[in-house]
C-alpha cells in the first residue's frame, strides 16, 4: 500500500523524502494508537491502509495550495489532522494553522506536531465563529455541507483569498455550489488528480463578497 502511496505522490508531482514517508507512517500509527483516547477516527477506518487513503486524499490538495502559494493556510476542523498535518508534513516551507474546537483532538494535534517536528504548525482550540484573524487560504475536509459555513468561512477570508473544500460526488458538490456561488467572486469545481475508483472533487471559493 505504501508503494502505491509513493506512486500517487509522484503523479501529483509532490516531492517527498524517505523521512517524509517515515514520519507519515509514524503519524498514522499514532492516530490508530490514540484514537480511542482522543476520539480521533471512527471504528470502520481504524486500520493502517484506511488511514493511508485519508492521508492520500489529504495530500491531493497540495498542488492547489502550491499553485495559489499562500504564506499560511488555515485548516478548519482539523480533527485527527487530515488534511492539516499531512499537508504540513509534505509542505514544510509554509505555515499551517490547525483550528479544532475539540479539546481532546487539539491536544492530540499539538502532541503529534511536536513529535513530528513540524515547526510550521500552530494549533488553535476554539470554534471557527470565534476566529478573529483573516487568512488567504482556508481548507476544510469532512466538514459537512458548505452552505452552512460559507458566510462564516468567508468572513475570515482575506480579500483575494481562496477556500478549498474537499468533496465527494459531483452532483452533491454542484448542488452545494449553486447555493453559495453568489457569495463569492468566483466558484469552481476541480476534479482530484488522484487515480481512484471514488469520486473526489475540490470546491474552490474565491474572494468573499459580503
Swiss-Prot record:
Gene3D superfamilies, per the entry: Vaccinia Virus protein VP39
Subcellular localization(s) per the UniProt record: Cytoplasm
Keyword Transmembrane carried by entry: no
EC number: 2.1.1.-
Cellular compartments per GO CC: cytosol
Enzyme class, spelled out: transferase
Keywords, ordered alphabetically: Cytoplasm, Methyltransferase, rRNA processing, S-adenosyl-L-methionine, Transferase
Domain of life (superkingdom): Bacteria
InterPro entries for this protein: rRNA_ssu_MeTfrase_G, SAM-dependent_MTases_sf
The protein's role, per its UniProt record: Specifically methylates the N7 position of a guanine in 16S rRNA.
Protein name: Ribosomal RNA small subunit methyltransferase G
Amino acid at each position: 500500500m505504501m508503494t502505491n502511496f509513493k506512486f500517487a505522490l509522484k503523479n501529483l508531482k509532490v516531492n517527498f523524502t524517505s523521512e517524509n514517508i517515515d514520519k507519515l507512517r509514524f503519524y498514522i500509527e499514532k492516530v490508530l494508537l490514540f484514537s480511542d483516547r482522543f476520539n480521533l477516527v471512527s471504528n470502520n477506518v481504524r486500520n493502517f491502509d484506511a488511514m493511508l487513503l485519508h492521508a492520500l486524499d489529504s495530500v491531493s490538495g497540495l498542488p492547489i495550495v502550491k499553485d495559489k502559494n499562500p504564506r499560511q493556510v488555515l485548516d478548519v476542523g482539523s480533527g485527527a489532522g487530515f488534511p492539516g498535518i499531512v499537508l504540513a508534513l509534505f509542505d514544510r516551507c509554509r505555515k499551517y494553522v490547525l483550528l479544532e474546537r475539540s479539546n481532546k483532538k487539539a491536544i492530540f494535534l499539538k502532541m503529534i506536531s511536536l513529535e513530528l517536528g513540524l515547526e510550521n504548525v500552530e494549533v488553535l482550540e476554539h470554534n471557527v465563529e470565534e476566529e478573529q484573524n483573516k487568512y488567504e487560504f482556508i481548507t476544510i475536509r469532512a466538514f459537512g455541507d458548505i452552505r452552512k459555513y460559507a458566510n462564516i468561512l468567508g468572513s475570515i477570508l482575506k480579500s483575494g483569498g481562496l477556500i478549498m473544500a474537499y468533496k465527494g460526488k459531483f452532483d452533491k458538490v454542484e448542488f452545494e455550489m449553486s447555493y453559495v456561488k453568489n457569495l463569492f467572486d468566483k466558484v469552481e469545481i476541480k476534479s482530484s488528480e488522484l487515480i481512484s475508483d471514488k469520486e473526489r472533487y475540490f470546491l474552490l471559493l474565491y474572494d468573499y463578497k459580503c
